[in-house]
């Protein structure tokens, strides 16, 4: 990867990191204050995205280093390892989310009706992440970077997660008898994102 490609890749991931930090804080704060477990789960996923972005930045930096005695074939494998780390983090998130959702459904705990403010946040996150998916995917194709493609796929996963959170909040708010949909959405998110993580892990 030459200097120009490395710089463009780094800028792409740096922008992604900034957005994820903002969205993680917003989702978690609104999710907790507005009683939306689905949005909280989406916020936790954004925290995982932050770790993934940091790993991607490290991977891009190390992959750019020249060959040396310890790495006669260059450092490009660090980029691949960073991509694998992203997918591994997604899988860990899915396991935690599945456990939380299942335990909530089994215990039958009372869940408060989420407020509509959570729906607005989920909707905004959906639009933002889909825009970033399209941007990151084009950059990945242009630069021929597997790491950036993994990062782009994570943006798409985020967009779908936010969409499901949006649906869960709206349904639970207007139909209180279906308030448990928050936990069902948690299971759906865990399954879908788990499959995505496995796909990225296999490359």
Regions found by a protein language model. Give the residues of each.
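Alpha-helical transmembrane cores and adjacent cytosolic helix/loop segments
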Residues: 1-203
């Amino acid at each position: 990867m030459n200097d120009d490609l490395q710089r463009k890749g780094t800028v792409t991931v740096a922008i992604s990191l900034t957005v994820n930090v903002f969205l993680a804080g917003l989702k978690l704060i609104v999710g907790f204050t507005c009683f939306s477990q689905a949005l909280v789960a989406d916020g936790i996923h954004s925290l995982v995205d932050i770790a993934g972005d940091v790993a991607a930045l490290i991977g891009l930096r190390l992959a750019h280093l020249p060959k040396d005695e310890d790495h006669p074939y260059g450092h490009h494998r660090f980029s691949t390892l960073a991509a694998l780390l992203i997918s591994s983090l997604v899988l860990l998130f899915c396991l935690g989310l599945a456990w939380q959702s299942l335990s909530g459904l089994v215990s039958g705990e009372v869940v408060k009706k989420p407020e509509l403010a959570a729906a607005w946040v989920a909707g905004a996150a959906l639009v933002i992440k889909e825009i970033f998916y399209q941007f990151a995917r084009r950059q990945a194709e242009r630069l021929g970077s597997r790491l950036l493609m993994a990062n782009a796929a994570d943006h798409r996963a985020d967009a779908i997660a936010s969409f499901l959170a949006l649906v869960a909040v709206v349904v639970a708010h207007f139909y209180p008898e279906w308030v448990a949909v928050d936990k069902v959405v948690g299971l759906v998110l865990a399954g879908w994102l788990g499959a995505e993580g496995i796909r990225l892990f296999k490359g």
